[in-house]
């Protein structure tokens, strides 16, 4: 009986690893496509400037970014999104859309996918592409 449970756990771990690999590959392909399309901001300052101008729809932070730097960047991102205003019907109205920040991939993987070196923070400029990246990750996780 105990051996059977160990075998089940091994199968589950292998399945989780395979799903993780598939999700990662699809995600990396999509951010590579975004880079080739010119729909990416590279690095912390470019991403923050893009957010302030309302041009960034998704911010990607590498999961192996040092914890202090990651926390600092998350705070800056949240602050930038909170201060984002759009002009609507002649009135300034605070943007209330979801903050799309994901922590995924390593710095090396993400940088390689977009053809740059040492880029732990990447911003996706195209709203539809950002939704596609998020949707594809969620679909893979849900098994759809």
Language model features with spans:
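A short, gly/pro- and small-residue-rich
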Residues: 69-88, 140-141
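Mid-chain, well-packed structural core segment of small domains
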Residues: 80-116
